[in-house]
Amino acid sequence: MSALPRSLREVNVEKLSQERFDVLVLGGGINGASSAAALAARGARAALVDRSDFASATSQESSNLVWGGIKYLEAYEIGLVRKLCRARNALLRSYPSSVREIRFFTSHTKGFRWPLWMLLVGSWLYWLLGGGFTRRPRLLTLRDIAREEPVVALDGLDGGFEYSDAYLPDNDARFVWNLVRTALDHGCAAANYVESLGSRREGEEWVTTARDLVSGRELSIRSRVLVNACGPYADGVNERAGVSTAHRHVLSKGIHLIVNRVTPSGRALTFFADDGRLFFVVPMGSRSCIGTTDTPADSPEVAVTAEDRRFVLENINKRLRLARPLTEADVVAERCGVRPLVVDAAGAGGRDWMQLSRRHVIESDPVKRHVTIFGGKLTDCLNVGQELCDEARRLGVALPRADQAWFGEPDASARQRFFDEAGRMGLDALAPPGAAERLWRRFGAGALGLLEAIRKDASAAQEVVEGGAVLRCEVEEAARGEMVVALDDFLRRRTAMAQVVRREDLRGSPGLREVCRILFGEGGQARLAEYFGDVSAPPERAGWRRAP
């Protein structure tokens, strides 16, 4: 009897132990994924590992916004705003399906610290700093607000304004996975659930001792350059490796509550919360994502508290005119994470930490050939990838394809080919509305293979869990090629199902049991029980949800 074929993940774990790499990237969030994709596409022998799943920390907890940082204008960080606006524009151009312009409908309260006219001027400055790439801002009268967004409560308002930024129609973690997929396609050895136990210098190399948390196997990964892209965990990783840096992180906790859609307009609603911070209601499929908070955190391990929920619900209920106030019973799901904010290692310089920006700093030790990525956010990921390539070159890594494009969707002709094929086979009649657009957005050129699967078996076009907006063929593709190890990887990161379907509805769904069967075979029932906490995970999987 022949052995079963090895999974994509198993193949990559083997590569990690057998090959020597130019660069090993620790941490598979947005910074690590963009770095690995850029390096691999340009010809470096790159490797990427994460202690948990890809994008399982900060990169799965954002507002799903791709924005130029309009709030940083208040701190006069004009250069940063211009840079972020350009980064946003580059993502809009490169990912026209995955990153979309969205209008922000902002109301203004009488007596706010900045008068309405000044905020309107700020929105025009923001538009100009972005090169006029998006639709122009406009002033909103109370009549405009009442007509266009009747859900907004008018009490205490004297008007508002509207401007543009961008957002991710799917989810942040899926965007990160697609960058990991790009890295894999260019030859990167990448694997999730590979824990770095420590790194040391041996001659001209870094030797990183790691453990495959699935098999328990220990391995040594050799690289010329070591990149720490562990986000909020980066300081601890550096300390364990004996690396001193001029920067460090302070952490800010932010939470979001997801509820049934509060407006059908497709806009993001923007308010100033009671603490003066920007406060959003962002579309998320059939739901709305409301937040965020900004509180200091001592550790990356955070959770939503009763006080957090109360703050978000009280603020949104004050500002919306709903049939009844939102309560905790209306919460479909929650998002909670920390923002790693970069400061000088000697301290934050006495500056109000709430005024710290999401800028990134890439710090390199040319003697040790060690690089740390501090701070950052999804909007800036293309800059991080480019700067990491520049830094790798300075550290002696050859990039034979230095001009190779490493990001973006397939060109318009490939997109048209896919939609023509979807039309010819009558996908709209076989699948829920919008399926073609979602498949292209999530899989790019690979979506043609999913159409072929549907052609062979029409049941592959069926939605697997009601309201989850995921087709059976997507589950099958995840089982084949998306390194799904735990059920949470699929429900929370490869898809947004766990964010738009209530947990109790997932538990009772026959479709979810079928998802587990496709993903895990005979082990599906055990994975399902682990996900809902009905049984404890076995020892080899007990630590999966901890730090990278």
Q: Each predicted region: which residue ranges?
A:
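Glycine-rich FAD pyrophosphate-binding loop
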Residues: 40-60
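Core beta-strand elements of the Rossmann-like FAD/NAD(P) dinucleotide-binding domain
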Residues: 19-21, 216-225
